[in-house]
């Protein structure tokens, strides 16, 4: 898979526009046969324009258009900076007080391949995921890349969080899509390399109290061995080296960020579902805890993404 149509959500407060820079690098590295379309998206809104009773609807509309035109002119220098025969630039600026809803509406109208958005880094160890980020993660029907800067690291390690707890058809399908997308990204980045991670649950300690004959060590080893077998089956399907698979005891919200930090991952790939957060190994609040602990970029994909 190569990206042919990319939507970049701009941040007016980010002067360097890291999301646009990352999208441009992505296009330049994938060596497409035809120009790739990069569309920038931005919302503008000023409540004072809505509250004025002195303006007619037509006058208010003209003022909106004036602000929109001004913002579009501000974007042009970036297009000049990244001008390339490989890229066809387009800009969309809409008047809206709900950036996420406006973005999802735009995505629904056009056949975009991926959304790229910058997410502010709060400190060395964590990122700030804004309310808009969370809305997009829940509602965006296509893969979304939330990045922390404008360039790719030298190692370009891609960590994919998978669920190998069982042979559930949904888990198998999601794992396949996650790994396939990760491999596509690694192929585009040339030096990109794939790692897989899964977390298996600790043995239930309380069971030893009710059942004296229960051996928690044997139980833990049994769970681990099953996860190792399932992970082996998954990695062999895609030709991934055993040294690049990580099967660790613990909870996903702890294991995934720990492994990402340990291998210095460039990006973590997760499966998402709309109403309950992230799935595969991840459900509900667990997903939010994983994301809040990440110190790298994130690529999220829904199971129904083609």
Q: Regions from the language model: what does each represent?
A:
Residues 39-41, 90-94, 145, 195-197, ...:
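General small-molecule cofactor/ligand-binding pocket signal
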Residues 116-119, 143-149, 299-302:
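Short beta-strand elements of ligand-binding domains
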Residues 59-73, 215-226:
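A short acidic, glycine-rich active-site loop
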Residues 117-135, 267-292:
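Glycine-rich, Arg-bearing micro-motifs that act as flexible, cationic patches
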Residues 42, 119, 198, 271-273, ...:
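Short secondary-structure boundary segments
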Residues 131-152:
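Short, structured interface segments
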Residues 1-59, 157-213, 237:
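Small/aliphatic-rich secondary-structure junction motif
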Residues 1-2, 80-115, 236-268, 276, ...:
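Structural beta-alpha unit
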């Amino acid at each position: 898979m190569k990206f042919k149509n990319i939507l970049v959500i701009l941040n007016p407060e980010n002067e360097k526009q890291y999301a646009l820079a990352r999208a441009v690098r992505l296009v330049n590295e994938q060596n497409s046969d035809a120009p790739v379309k990069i569309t920038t998206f931005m919302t503008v809104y000023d409540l004072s324009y809505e509250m004025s009773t002195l303006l007619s609807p037509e006058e208010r509309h003209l003022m909106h258009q004036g602000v929109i035109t001004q913002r579009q002119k501000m974007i042009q220098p970036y297009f000049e900076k990244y001008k390339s025969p490989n890229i066809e630039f387009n800009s969309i600026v809409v008047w809206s007080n709900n950036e996420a809803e406006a973005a999802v509406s735009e995505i629904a109208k056009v056949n975009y391949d991926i959304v790229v958005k910058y997410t502010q880094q709060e400190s060395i160890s964590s990122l700030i995921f804004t309310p808009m980020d969370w809305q997009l993660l829940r509602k965006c029907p296509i893969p979304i890349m939330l990045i922390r800067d404008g360039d790719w690291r030298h190692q370009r390690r891609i960590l994919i969080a998978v669920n190998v707890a069982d042979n559930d058809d949904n888990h198998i399908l999601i794992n396949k899509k996650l790994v396939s997308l990760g491999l596509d990204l690694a192929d585009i980045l040339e030096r990109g390399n794939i790692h897989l991670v899964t977390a298996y649950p600790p043995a239930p300690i309380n069971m030893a109290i009710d059942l004296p004959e229960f051996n928690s060590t044997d139980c833990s080893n049994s769970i681990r061995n099953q996860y190792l077998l399932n992970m082996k089956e998954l990695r062999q399907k895609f030709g991934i080296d055993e040294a690049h698979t990580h099967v660790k005891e613990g909870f996903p919200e702890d294991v995934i960020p720990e492994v990402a930090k340990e291998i210095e991952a460039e990006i973590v790939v997760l499966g998402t579902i709309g109403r309950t957060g992230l799935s595969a190994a991840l459900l509900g609040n667990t997903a939010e805890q994983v994301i809040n602990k990440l110190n790298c970029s994130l690529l999220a994909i829904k199971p129904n993404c083609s």
